[in-house]
Curated annotation (Swiss-Prot):
Pathway terms, separated by semicolons: Isoprenoid biosynthesis; isopentenyl diphosphate biosynthesis via DXP pathway; isopentenyl diphosphate from 1-deoxy-D-xylulose 5-phosphate: step 5/6
NCBIfam families membership: ispG_gcpE (TIGR00612), PRK00366.1 (NF001540)
Function noted in UniProt: Converts 2C-methyl-D-erythritol 2,4-cyclodiphosphate (ME-2,4cPP) into 1-hydroxy-2-methyl-2-(E)-butenyl 4-diphosphate.
GO BP field: isopentenyl diphosphate biosynthetic process, methylerythritol 4-phosphate pathway; terpenoid biosynthetic process
Pfam families (alphabetical): GcpE (PF04551)
Keyword match Ligase: no
Superkingdom in the source lineage: Bacteria
Protein name: 4-hydroxy-3-methylbut-2-en-1-yl diphosphate synthase (flavodoxin)
Top EC class, one word: oxidoreductase
Name of the gene encoding the protein in the UniProt record: ispG
Binding site for [4Fe-4S] cluster: 272, 275, 307, 314
Length: 366
């Protein structure tokens, strides 16, 4: 039994699928993905952005393939990246076949707009022959005409009906290596649709709030929407959609999972907003430490608190902690225990040193 049951999240057990060497669903870690915003035909720019996204901690990267030149470019792109590539396909079934044959490990499609049964059969055959999974991507902005006419507007029931229709299309062709998403730019609609879908299927679910907005608004909307679902135990892979640098999507995605203890990777920093009581410059210190500790992948906790009101209590619950003290004499905590005083000007170097040392110790135990 958990010592802190109020923190427990019981994930729904879903089927397991493979996207390259990444397993999605079941007890596997919730994966984080992003999407390139380069022209896929600009092969060098796309390779660079994929590698930047991967370096930030992405498990998967999606690439748009709007034309033949883009889907064929995957053959060269996949030679120079080590993260599984998902090809984003709309309307033209040949693009999906080309992507599967040229290195994509997953196809993001909506079977309902790919074409007739013969075309869908050809796409699924290419996917099977190339060990390529599929994501059924239902979106409130592109629902089937008859479903929209039935429900009058996008609603949770409409998204779920579209998903179930597309699930049947794949199952009827004996294809089961797929995940599903039911996205909307509306948080309430998205949450309700995913909750309904989770009740009627055990295929893995890809979570996202589509067209969420810029960095601030998009991060907030995604955190509320995805956070609510993840706390319900729903979701096997996530994407934060931002009108910004795709690398930032990975930062936010990993922070959401880290905050919910669903995937601990890297240093989790607990810090105060600072006030007149701070004994050192908390905000500047945190910004510098976030940058200097970005290379640490070992999960551990660090508290940076500017005064003694909450500092000792927070430090007692983290691996490493700094609590502000009078006259620049701040207290360093190691494993929740007071260690020694540290001058304000030495905080950065000392904390970095202690974090790296602690990470090395933990790595040896793994």
């Amino acid at each position: 039994m958990s010592l802190r049951p109020f923190r427990d999240i019981h994930r729904k057990k879903t089927k397991v699928i493979n996207v390259g060497d990444v397993k999605i669903g079941g007890d596997n870690p919730i994966s984080v993905q992003s999407m390139t915003n380069t022209l896929t035909t600009d092969i060098q720019a796309t390779i660079k952005q994929i590698n930047d996204i991967h370096e930030e901690g992405a498990d998967l990267v999606r690439v748009s393939c709007p034309d033949e030149e883009s889907s064929l470019a995957l053959k060269e792109i996949t030679k120079h990246v080590s993260v599984p590539i998902i090809a984003d396909i709309h309307f033209h079934y040949k693009r999906a076949i080309e992507a599967a044959e040229n290195g994509a490990k997953c196809l993001r499609i909506n079977p309902g707009n790919i074409g007739d049964k013969l075309k869908i059969h050809d796409v699924l055959s290419a996917a099977k022959n190339n060990d390529c999974s599929i994501r059924i991507g239902v979106n409130a902005g592109s629902l089937e005409k008859d479903i929209l006419e039935k429900y009058k507007e996008p609603c949770p029931e409409a998204l779920v009906e579209s998903a179930q229709r597309n699930i049947k299309i794949l199952e009827d062709q004996d294809f089961f290596n797929f995940k599903i998403s039911v996205k909307s730019s509306d948080i309430f609609l998205s949450i309700a649709a995913y909750r309904q879908l989770s009740k009627v299927t055990d295929y893995p679910l890809h979570l996202g709030i589509t067209e969420a907005g810029g960095f601030v608004s998009g991060s907030v909307k995604s955190s509320i929407g995805l956070g609510s679902l993840l706390m319900d135990g729903i979701g096997d892979t996530i994407r934060i959609s931002l009108s910004d640098d795709p690398v930032k999507e990975i930062k936010i995605g990993n922070e959401i999972l880290k905050s919910l203890n669903l995937r601990n990777r890297g240093v989790k920093i607990i810090s105060c907003p600072s006030c007149a009581r701070q004994a050192f410059q908390v905000i500047d210190t945190v910004k510098i430490l976030e940058d200097k500790l970005a290379h640490i992948k070992t999960p551990l906790t660090l508290s940076i608190i500017g005064c003694v009101v909450n500092g000792p209590g927070e430090a007692a619950m983290t691996d490493i902690g700094i609590t502000g003290g009078g006259k620049g004499n701040n207290m360093l905590y190691l494993s929740g225990i007071q260690s020694e005083k540290v001058l304000s000007e030495d905080i950065i170097s000392r904390v970095v040193s202690e974090v790296e040392k602690k990470a090395a110790e933990l790595d040896k135990k793994l």
